């Protein structure tokens, strides 16, 4: 168990280093997923503040989604976070997948954000 957690932290740190190198002042789109929900937030690391956030826990989305843990929910969250970001004037971000593999729900969220107008 401890080795698994160490491997997770190594993967997460490796991805975070790559993001810092490629960011060039752009905010990052951070993804967090659980077995029941998915969360996305756009963070400005220079200022240390969250600009935009969206999750499958929001009441207006919960009624329209079958569950918060599937690919359709992730795509909807991606589109929602992109809409909110463009409303605040953020169009270019760097994608932070964390320690998650770019597959399934994480990939769907990224595709939804691209469809919503974010560039990364």
Curated annotation (Swiss-Prot):
InterPro entries: Ribosomal_uL18_bac-type (IPR004389), Ribosomal_uL18_bac/euk (IPR005484). Disulfide bonds: none annotated. GO terms for biological process: translation. Pfam families: Ribosomal_L18p. It comes from the Bacteria. GO terms for molecular function: 5S rRNA binding; structural constituent of ribosome. Keywords: Ribonucleoprotein, Ribosomal protein, RNA-binding, rRNA-binding. One of its GO terms (cellular component) is ribosome. This is one of the proteins that bind and probably mediate the attachment of the 5S RNA into the large ribosomal subunit, where it forms part of the central protuberance. Part of the 50S ribosomal subunit; part of the 5S rRNA/L5/L18/L25 subcomplex. Contacts the 5S and 23S rRNAs. Belongs to the universal ribosomal protein uL18 family. HAMAP family: Ribosomal_uL18_B. This is Large ribosomal subunit protein uL18. It comes from Azorhizobium caulinodans (strain ATCC 43989 / DSM 5975 / JCM 20966 / LMG 6465 / NBRC 14845 / NCIMB 13405 / ORS 571). The gene is rplR.
């Amino acid at each position: 168990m401890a080795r698994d957690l160490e491997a997770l932290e190594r993967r997460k740190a490796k991805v975070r280093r790559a993001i810092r190198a490629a960011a060039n002042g752009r905010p990052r789109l951070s993804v967090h997923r659980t077995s029941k929900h998915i969360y996305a937030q756009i963070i400005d690391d220079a200022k240390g503040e969250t600009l935009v956030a969206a999750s499958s826990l929001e009441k207006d989305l919960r009624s329209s989604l079958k569950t918060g843990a599937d690919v359709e929910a992730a795509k909807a969250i991606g589109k929602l976070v992109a809409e909110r970001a463009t409303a605040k004037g953020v169009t270019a971000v760097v994608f932070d997948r964390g320690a998650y593999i770019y597959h399934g729900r994480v990939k769907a969220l990224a595709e939804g954000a691209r469809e919503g107008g974010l560039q990364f």
